[in-house]
């Protein structure tokens, strides 16, 4: 076993040869390298597959032996100070290694098809391979300073990939926003690392955990300083994992290519913050105030992310806010000490969200021939609809991913989310209520995304489409805005006399000629692809979707309990995940109870599934064909018209829409307070520098010049007069100097 562990340091380095080869190829033989660019995908996938095999082998040994292996070598030695560099292999590391490598391989395969026609194909593979290397190095780090080194590399790669299409001003602005926002968290992380080094004298995890065990009994360390340093460490995780209030970079990060969006949201960037907290949980567990703060931030984030996803029209941004909300669940679980549930949800969410993002990329590819390559159009769900007829494989995989994230059994996210909900209710009813309500919201907005994209009819053909926003459905709101002039009401999402309906995306009453017009764009699947209608993507992009679908269907079973032998009070709880995550310290609430109550599990499951089904039902009523049926009933329409509360409900809808579509006004607040405030401060500084500092300097010089010009005419041009005045000046100077 130890023989295998000794070569674990190879795992983060395996993708590097391809990166270096592509770099040297572009420098030495650029023409040949670019002509053979598609070949470079194979070694990238191959080397990461080898890393995956190593990771699986290490994980099997962890499950069988539950041992921890650490190897260190000195990097810097100076008197009593020693900075070590090495790697740590434990259950947490092995889980993250498998997660990163499996998702990374599928994203690389998908990227070969998605980026095949892009001029930056090689550059993209260099960035994404280095991204994988950085994340693998981060999860195998053995101390805080090593984590910080790879932490910054992960941030750099995300900056390069978010701004991959840097010629687009929006993408350039998005990567800068992500970089600046994460600098806030990274600065806090660095201060926290330095603070704990000053307190403990070590950066190694094992030393920190040993000292943390003695904090409460000895009470020899300033608790305020320790809490402050722990808060600074947590600030780094807040920025990286897009937690409130440093979440604003995540939706804008969707300006990058879709494969990198999948990798960031599933296994790399946002997972780094959760990993850091999980790694340092034995340290945080000794600070109850920090644990309460972590759970509070997670609760706010999971609810805020769900509300902001309600009215988004961009398919990728809707999924981004979904990620933000699910990361809030993980943060809540860590804050209440539910270590296993947090990591379980990290695993299940990673595969489901990777499936959804890659599926959205397939949808975007199918829409681009119709609406163009601008993300404002190709990612706009207002222009989609009815895609189930044209891309059935993508539709099937996307549906399963949606149901998984909604918490429908027996899909992956059901098991992990149900565990978090149960533990949150046990910890605090306040957290339990918000987490449960958000679970219903999750089902609603996720099924909304599915229905807008695949349900109904293809809306882009309902008018004479053009590239201008004013003449397209781009400006049509799904939440009750008025219909722009020039748009035929027969072709608008469900309408009333005053405007577009709050939720529905279907036509309440479709005329016969309209159906014929829709039918003219429909052909049977399998016919020759044309640009008149969307079509399925190639096998290179479909294969990862099918593999991720298998993970979504079956990965949740690693957390299902099975009988480990009869006990006096019940049945002993044992899962593959719990055996895998056998911790050296029992710092989770759920692990302290070794018994599982089947009745309690069924009760909790029924409650969570009921919430999910209710959210799906509401979404179907507002977005599905059922809404059109009810809209056409004169009795219900007349009842709604006579209802005195209708105006109040409409106002509530508009307020919810404004809150969600404007991102909770948080971005506007940051722009006005920080961006405009800093710009105003720089303008004031510039005025002070040029007007005051430079003014004084230039004024002294100008005054000296003017005085000199006046004095030179006093002597009348005679040398004797100049000598006389010179002696007078010297005499006055000596008088004051000597006195």
From Swiss-Prot:
Keywords of this entry: Chloroplast, Membrane, NAD, NADP, Plastid, Plastoquinone, Quinone, Thylakoid, Translocase, Transmembrane, Transmembrane helix, Transport
Any one Gene Ontology molecular-function term assigned to this protein's record: NADH dehydrogenase (ubiquinone) activity
Single GO cellular component term: chloroplast thylakoid membrane
InterPro entries associated with the record: NADH_UbQ_OxRdtase_chlpt_su5_C, NADHpl_OxRdtase_5_subgr, ND/Mrp_TM, NU5C-like, Proton_antipo_N
Enzyme class: translocase
Gene3D superfamilies tied to this protein: 1.20.5.2700
Subcellular location: Plastid, Chloroplast thylakoid membrane
Chief location category: plastid
Annotated EC: 7.1.1.-
PANTHER family: NADH-UBIQUINONE OXIDOREDUCTASE CHAIN 5
Reported function: NDH shuttles electrons from NAD(P)H:plastoquinone, via FMN and iron-sulfur (Fe-S) centers, to quinones in the photosynthetic chain and possibly in a chloroplast respiratory chain. The immediate electron acceptor for the enzyme in this species is believed to be plastoquinone. Couples the redox reaction to proton translocation, and thus conserves the redox energy in a proton gradient.
Protein name, as recorded: NAD(P)H-quinone oxidoreductase subunit 5, chloroplastic
Gene that encodes the chain: ndhF
């Amino acid at each position: 076993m130890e023989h295998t562990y000794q070569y674990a340091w190879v795992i983060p380095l395996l993708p590097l040869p391809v990166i270096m080869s592509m770099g040297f190829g572009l420098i030495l033989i650029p023409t040949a390298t670019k002509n053979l660019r598609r070949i470079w995908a194979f070694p990238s996938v191959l080397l990461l597959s080898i890393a995956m095999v190593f990771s699986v082998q290490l994980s099997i040994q962890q499950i069988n032996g539950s041992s921890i292996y650490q190897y260190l070598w000195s990097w810097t030695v100076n008197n009593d100070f020693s900075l070590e560099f090495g790697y740590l292999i434990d259950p947490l590391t092995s889980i993250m290694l498998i997660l990163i490598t499996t998702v990374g391989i599928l994203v690389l395969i998908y990227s070969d098809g998605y980026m095949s026609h892009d001029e930056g194909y090689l550059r993209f593979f260099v960035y994404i391979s280095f991204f994988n290397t950085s994340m693998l190095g981060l999860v195998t780090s053995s101390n805080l300073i090593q984590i910080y080194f790879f932490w910054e590399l992960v941030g750099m790669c995300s900056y390069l990939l978010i701004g991959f299409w840097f010629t687009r001003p929006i993408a350039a602005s998005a990567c800068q926003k992500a970089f600046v926002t994460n600098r806030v968290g990274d600065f806090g992380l660095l201060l926290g690392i330095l603070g704990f080094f000053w307190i403990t004298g070590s950066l190694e995890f094992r030393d920190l955990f040993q000292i943390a065990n003695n904090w409460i009994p000895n009470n020899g360390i300033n608790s305020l300083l320790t809490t402050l340093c722990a808060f600074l460490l947590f600030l780094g995780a807040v920025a990286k994992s897009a937690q409130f209030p440093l979440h604003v970079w995540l939706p804008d990060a969707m300006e990058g290519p879709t494969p990198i969006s999948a990798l960031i949201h599933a296994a790399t960037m946002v997972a780094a913050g959760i990993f850091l907290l999980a790694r340092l949980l034995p340290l945080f567990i000794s600070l109850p105030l920090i644990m309460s703060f972590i759970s509070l931030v997670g609760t706010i984030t999971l609810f805020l992310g769900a509300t902001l996803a309600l009215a988004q029209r961009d398919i990728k941004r809707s999924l981004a806010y979904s990620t933000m909300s699910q990361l809030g669940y993980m943060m809540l679980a860590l804050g209440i000490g539910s270590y296993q549930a947090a990591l379980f949800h990290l695993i299940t969410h990673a595969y489901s969200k990777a499936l959804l993002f890659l599926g959205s990329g397939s949808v975007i590819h199918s829409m681009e021939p119709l609406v163009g390559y601008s993300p404002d159009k190709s990612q706009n769900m207002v222009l989609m609809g009815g895609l189930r007829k044209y891309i059935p494989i993508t539709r099937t995989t996307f549906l399963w991913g949606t149901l998984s994230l909604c918490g429908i059994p027996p899909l992956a996210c059901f098991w992990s989310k149900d565990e978090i909900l149960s533990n949150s209710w046990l910890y605090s009813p306040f957290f339990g209520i918000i987490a449960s309500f958000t679970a219903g919201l999750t089902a609603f907005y996720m099924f909304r995304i599915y229905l807008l994209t695949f349900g109904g009819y293809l809306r882009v053909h309902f008018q004479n489409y053009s590239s201008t926003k004013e003449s397209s459905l781009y400006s049509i709101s799904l939440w009750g805005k008025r219909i722009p002039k020039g748009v035929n009401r027969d072709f608008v999402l469900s309408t009333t006399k005053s405007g577009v309906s709050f939720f529905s995306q279907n036509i309440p009453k479709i005329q016969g000629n309209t159906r014929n017009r829709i039918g003219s764009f429909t052909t049977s699947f399998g016919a020759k692809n044309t640009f008149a209608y969307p079509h399925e993507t190639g096998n290179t992009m479909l294969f990862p979707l099918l593999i991720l679908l298998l993970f979504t269907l079956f990965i949740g079973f690693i957390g299902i309990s099975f009988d480990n032998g009869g006990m006096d009070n019940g049945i002993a709880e044992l899962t593959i995940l719990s055996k895998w995550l056998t911790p050296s310290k029992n710092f989770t609430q759920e692990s302290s109870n070794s018994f599982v109550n089947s009745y309690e599990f069924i009760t909790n499951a029924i409650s969570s599934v009921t919430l999910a089904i209710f959210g799906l039902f509401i979404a179907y009523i507002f977005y599905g064909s059922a809404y059109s049926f009810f809209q056409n009933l004169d009795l219900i329409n007349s009842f709604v018209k006579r209802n005195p509360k209708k105006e109040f409900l409409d106002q509530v809808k508009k307020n919810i829409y404004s809150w969600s579509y404007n991102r909770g006004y948080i971005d506007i607040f940051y722009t006005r307070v920080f961006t405009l405030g800093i710009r105003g401060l720089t303008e004031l500084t510039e005025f002070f520098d040029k007007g005051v500092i430079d003014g004084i300097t230039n004024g002294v010089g100008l005054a000296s010049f003017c005085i000199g010009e006046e004095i030179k005419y006093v002597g009348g041009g005679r040398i004797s007069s100049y000598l006389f005045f010179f002696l007078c000046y010297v005499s006055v100077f000596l008088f004051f100097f000597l006195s």
